[in-house]
Amino acid sequence: MPAATACATGPDWRQTKFYDLTRVAIVPMAFCFPGYDASGSDLPPPPLCAATWRAGVMAALPALRLVLAVGGAALRWHLGPGRVQDQVIGWRAALAQGVFPLPHPSWRNTAWLKRNPWFEAELVPELRTRVRAVLEAE
């Protein structure tokens, strides 16, 4: 269940469509927790994990209408090599491939969001529209 703020201001998260396995699949880049680095931050997903099983999982989901690629590992897997910044800036081109490129949600991105106001002004509204369309489709 989302945080209290999201529940108070957003859609009714209790609706069954948010938990309908035929509509939404959250597929991580690794099915393990890779641990912490020396400073206590989460380590990125090991490339071996996605190399081992990701293609099979994605093939088992043939009717995907929208892929939200969140973070560098997911962006590289879905869109190929490149900087997260460049892939997110090129979100319209990525949408042509059926992929919505997003930075990893983190407090570390606060400064990036302030330097890139287009993200919340342009990308986020389009993301909301696309997600709503997928969830409301019958």
Predicted segment positions?
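A polyanion-binding, active-site-adjacent surface
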Residues: 1-136
